[in-house]
Amino acid sequence: MARNENVQGELKEKMVDLRRVAKTVKGGRRMSFSAVVVVGDGNGRVGAGLGKAAEIPEAVRKGTEDAKKHMIKIPLNGTTIPHEVIGRFGAGKVLLKPASPGTGVIAGGAVRAVLEAAGVRDILTKSLGSNNAANQVLATLAGLRQLKSAEEVAKLRGKPVEQILG
């Protein structure tokens, strides 16, 4: 288990980014910490949160609480995602493509953390645009939010699932 991973109940949490930030005031700079935390159950539920505080543990705790509040459920096709999708947030853009079993998670740091927490085992990704960890995490979540299962698509189109799958 990595240094910045915690298994709490059935939720796995991982700190993706920690930064020291400064607010300039009359008397100088006021330092604090900003933490991006990803939380997931490894079975299709994942969330991300941002916490800010004067101390590191407090920033991580706030980020974890925020992530738990903003969890989403994603449809999985076995160990991968149902279809290709592009997630965008700010200047960050993440391309997510389904992969055949045994491929593994082909992704960079921040995107990998989100996908592993969600329980995706086989996927191909490409990060485009911003390489800011917070933007990449939120772009990945935006992409995962767009995913629809074959059943959902069939219901929306008013067609049988077999016709959608081909």
Swiss-Prot record:
InterPro entries: Ribosomal_Su5_D2-typ_SF, Ribosomal_uS5, Ribosomal_uS5_bac-type, Ribosomal_uS5_C, Ribosomal_uS5_N, Ribosomal_uS5_N_CS, Ribsml_uS5_D2-typ_fold_subgr. The keyword Ligase does not apply. GO terms for molecular function: rRNA binding; structural constituent of ribosome. Transmembrane segments: none annotated. Signal peptide: none annotated. One of its GO terms (biological process) is translation. GO terms for cellular component: small ribosomal subunit. Residues 11-74 form the S5 DRBM domain. Keywords: Ribonucleoprotein, Ribosomal protein, RNA-binding, rRNA-binding. PROSITE patterns: RIBOSOMAL_S5, S5_DSRBD. With S4 and S12 plays an important role in translational accuracy. Located at the back of the 30S subunit body where it stabilizes the conformation of the head with respect to the body. PANTHER family: MITOCHONDRIAL RIBOSOMAL PROTEIN S5 (PTHR48277:SF1). Part of the 30S ribosomal subunit. Contacts proteins S4 and S8. The N-terminal domain interacts with the head of the 30S subunit; the C-terminal domain interacts with the body and contacts protein S4. The interaction surface between S4 and S5 is involved in control of translational fidelity. Belongs to the universal ribosomal protein uS5 family. This is Small ribosomal subunit protein uS5. It comes from Symbiobacterium thermophilum (strain DSM 24528 / JCM 14929 / IAM 14863 / T). The gene is rpsE.
